[in-house]
């Protein structure tokens, strides 16, 4: 099929001087031209016809550039008027150009090219026209070469002389002369005939031929025998050999050698992970990573077993890396800071980003930048509110998978991180590291304003709010603001009256678990702090220190407004509300407000009728403690 033949066009031999050696005979353009029948031409689409036109024109120009030598070596090249659709003129022109000496195109070659150009320019719109007529038989032909072949068969000759064939073809040529000019696409010049344009274009052929020769050299130089369906794929593939990187990332200038690699790389700067594993649902940035995951995780045999924990791995390299978690080996050491790593990938990432300060992954919501792309992806869940990891026990959801794993230890009771000094165990490794600083005395977080140091970074951040006055955590019920979130949570229980931690000995309830533990020491007499002055015991050292101020008379907390002094800071804070007029405790029954919480509790007993203070002598009950004390004085005066 002709159409298929043109799509898979074989390489047309390059015409060089080897074709025109006298010992091998003369080669003309007609010898290497390709022809189609009327039916075959009708099967070609516009793109295929254009390709045919370009190939034939290139071969013609190449033949003209090296010289056809078809019996006219000593003659000068014909001009525009020499050969045309109208006939032969006697006008002559000099050689085609100074850059191509002795370059000629014989009349036969020009006529063949005119046939091809006529057909391709009309694009088969007039397929019934057959401008070549045989004088002997009266038959019509689409191409002059077909007419010549027919006449050879009629005469029994295999070859005819050039003079006879040229005259015959010229006399039988019925190509209508177009009124339009033929422009050169290389320079702004028009020609009245196709032949004039062809002769002019041979002046460009030497430079074009040299350029194509360089391209051919590069193709041979980097030849790797890979085959591609489209030219664009060949161009991108050649960049592998040349090292060219045509696609550049705007964010930080990374260059890549193909558009596909560029698109794949861009996914590292966003959250797109289009390749999803159909077995486990895990998604990946690149198709190659997905294929590797499926081969390694789901299909590949896990024949390497860790003798420490029994975990199976798919490769010996993975087993060696895994065993470092047991033996503590960290072979990759940073020569800048001395930090060591178990995995080479982590080590390389540390060197590339930590010491250079590079943070290429920027959150478009808040502008925060990150060293790794996965850190940015996890951070963006803060803005989207996505909590993909849910606890199957209590339904609580988390942003990070590690947070879920840590939370689940609350249900299982697992505390894998144990202190070697005191044996105390922790759920989180971070808590163990913070605890170990108690034994070492290390306090790495120092306030630059007052110099106070802290074991935990959270304590340091909370302390800084004292200097800045920031109270970021506000109560939604009463509008009171607090420095820390933990203090706000404690405060909320005032409104809800929630006391979830109850003592099993006396039934007393507490807001916090730590308060319950401190209280239980009273019953167990464990680690009680006893006052040397009066023998009173306390469950916590802090309470003992506050109590001892009663004996010493120390009142270190002074009011800046009135100069009144107090033993405890909490008492000073409560007192300062007298000056500010703040009354944060409101009665829900009568909307009366109070400065102190205990005053609100006492007031509410008026509405409830509760009288918890009962006299042991007469059984009379009171709603306030001082009312009971005042009543008991009556019984004292009655005694003899």
Curated annotation (Swiss-Prot):
PROSITE patterns the UniProt entry points to: KRAB, ZINC_FINGER_C2H2_1, ZINC_FINGER_C2H2_2
Keyword Plastid: no
GO CC annotation, single: nucleus
Annotated compartments: Nucleus
Keywords in alphabetical order: DNA-binding, Isopeptide bond, Metal-binding, Nucleus, Repeat, Transcription, Transcription regulation, Ubl conjugation, Zinc, Zinc-finger
Zinc finger residue extent: C2H2-type: 217-241, 247-269, 275-298, 304-326, 332-355, 361-383, 389-411, 417-439, 445-467, 473-495, 501-523, 529-551, 557-579, 585-607, 613-635
Cross-link (Glycyl lysine isopeptide (Lys-Gly) (interchain with G-Cter in SUMO2)): 223
Domain (KRAB): residue spans on this chain: 27-140
Any one GO MF annotation of this record: DNA-binding transcription factor activity
Matching Pfam families: KRAB, zf-C2H2
Main location: nucleus
GO biological process: regulation of transcription by RNA polymerase II
Domain of life assignment: Eukaryota
Family: Belongs to the krueppel C2H2-type zinc-finger protein family.
Its job: May be involved in transcriptional regulation.
Protein name as it appears in the record: Zinc finger protein 549
Lineage: Eukaryota, Metazoa, Chordata, Craniata, Vertebrata
């Amino acid at each position: 099929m002709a159409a298929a033949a043109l799509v898979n066009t074989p390489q047309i031999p390059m015409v060089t001087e080897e074709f025109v050696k006298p010992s091998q005979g003369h080669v003309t353009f007609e010898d290497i031209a390709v022809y189609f029948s009327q039916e075959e031409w009708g099967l070609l689409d516009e793109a295929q016809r254009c390709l045919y036109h370009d190939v034939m024109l290139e071969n013609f120009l190449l033949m003209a550039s090296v010289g056809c030598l078809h019996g006219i070596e000593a003659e000068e090249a014909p001009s525009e008027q020499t050969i045309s659709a109208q006939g032969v003129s006697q006008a002559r022109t000099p050689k085609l150009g100074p850059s191509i000496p002795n370059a000629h195109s014989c009349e036969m070659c020009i006529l063949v090219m005119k046939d091809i150009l006529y057909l391709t320019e009309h694009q088969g719109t007039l397929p019934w026209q057959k401008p070549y007529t045989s004088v002997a038989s009266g038959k019509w032909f689409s191409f002059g070469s077909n007419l010549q072949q027919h006449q050879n068969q009629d005469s029994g000759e295999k070859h005819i002389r050039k003079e006879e064939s040229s005259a015959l073809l010229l006399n039988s040529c019925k190509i209508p002369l177009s009124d339009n000019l033929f422009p050169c696409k290389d320079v702004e010049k028009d020609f009245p005939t196709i032949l004039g344009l062809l002769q002019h274009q041979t002046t460009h052929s030497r430079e074009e031929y040299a350029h194509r020769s360089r391209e051919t050299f590069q193709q041979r130089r980097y030849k790797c025998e890979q085959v591609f369906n489209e030219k664009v794929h060949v161009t991108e593939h050649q960049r592998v050999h040349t090292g060219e990187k045509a696609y550049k990332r705007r964010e930080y200038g990374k260059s890549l050698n193909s558009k596909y690699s560029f698109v794949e790389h861009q996914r590292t700067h966003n959250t797109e992970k289009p390749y999803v594993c159909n077995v486990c649902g895990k998604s990946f940035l690149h198709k190659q990573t997905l294929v590797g995951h499926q081969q390694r995780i789901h299909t590949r045999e896990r024949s390497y077993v860790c003798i420490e924990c029994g975990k199976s791995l798919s490769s010996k390299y993975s087993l060696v890396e895994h065993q470092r978690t047991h033996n503590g080996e960290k072979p990759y050491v940073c020569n800048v800071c001395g930090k060591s790593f178990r995995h080479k990938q982590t080590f390389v990432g540390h060197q590339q980003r930590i010491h250079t300060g590079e943070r290429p992954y920027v959150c478009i919501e808040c502008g925060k930048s990150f060293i790794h792309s996965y850190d940015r992806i996890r951070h963006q869940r803060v803005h989207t509110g996505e909590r993909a990891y849910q606890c199957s026990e209590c339904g609580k959801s988390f942003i990070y998978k590690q947070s879920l794993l840590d939370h689940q230890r609350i249900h299982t009771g697992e505390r894998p991180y144990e202190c070697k000094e005191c044996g105390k165990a922790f759920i989180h490794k971070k808590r163990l590291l913070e605890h170990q600083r108690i034994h070492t005395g290390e306090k790495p977080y120092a306030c630059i304003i007052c110099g106070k140091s802290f074991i935990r970074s959270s304590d340091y951040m909370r302390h800084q709010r004292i200097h800045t006055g920031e109270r970021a955590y506000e109560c939604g019920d009463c509008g009171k603001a607090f420095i820390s979130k933990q203090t706000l949570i404690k405060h909320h229980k005032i409104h809800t009256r929630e006391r979830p931690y109850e003592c099993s000995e006396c039934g007393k309830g507490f807001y916090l678990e730590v308060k319950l533990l401190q209280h239980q020491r009273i019953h167990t007499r464990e680690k009680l702090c006893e006052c040397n002055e009066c023998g009173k015991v306390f469950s916590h050292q802090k309470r003992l220190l506050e109590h001892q101020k009663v004996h010493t008379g120390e009142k270190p907390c002074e009011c800046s407004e009135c100069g009144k002094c107090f033993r405890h800071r909490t008492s000073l804070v409560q007192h300062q509300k007298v000056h500010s007029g703040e009354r944060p405790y409101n009665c829900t029954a009568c909307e009366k407000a109070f400065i102190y919480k205990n005053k609100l509790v006492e007031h509410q007993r008026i509405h409830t009728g509760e009288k918890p203070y009962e006299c042991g002598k007469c059984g009379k009950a009171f709603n306030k403690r001082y009312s009971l004390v005042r009543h008991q004085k009556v019984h004292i005066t009655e005694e003899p």
